[in-house]
Amino acid sequence: FLQLVPDISGSIDNSNAIPLGFSSPVMVVDNSVFIFPTMGKDADNNIKRYTYNLSAQKLTGMVKMDVPANTMPINIIKVTNRKAYVPFYTLGVVWIVDIETMQKTGEIDLKPYSHKDSSPEPAFGIVRDGLYYLPLDQINENFMPYEDYRQVDVAVIDTKTDKVQKIISEKTSKLSFPTRPMLRNMIFTDEHNDIYIACAGNFGLNPTYLNNGFVCIPAGS
């Protein structure tokens, strides 16, 4: 369940809460709260947007956008006041979305950049200087990096044209799995406007491959 709790004194129940699917991702962007679908047969295959009503201290004005089943849209990145990007993890595309109407206005195809399967697994990106830097996880059917592809790929997308400008890669460190699609703090800029990307690798589960850490995309590059 999801609800606003302006006063934590006294008792709280879920009588006025918004029901969610199991482990449904929730993301706040400015005054909007987005609820993404869970996986499985019980999923509501849509993305819902609620607006925070300050005077009423409630989430109001729900608008939703239907999405294909089991495609894992998990985050939304604001580009302008009306435009946002929604990557679909298993589909290998990014939808261009009107935030106000929750309508799809376009699509960016990333499937040609996949290592072996049909999706390069676009994860959690960030906008800097008019460019959308979107890490590609490039994982196998076990949700782990390919043993023959231990590198970091990032799609660089022009936010004016919505076109892939290039794919940049870091291969020397043998890092992989750059960001998880539900964890926004795995990618950020510092005070110098450099982008840092956390790379999980095999999450420490493979004793022969323990590489993890950060890659950096310096400002101006």
Short names for language-model regions:
Residues P37-K41, P87-L91, D137-I139, A200-F203:
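Short loop/turn segments immediately following the C-termini of beta-strands
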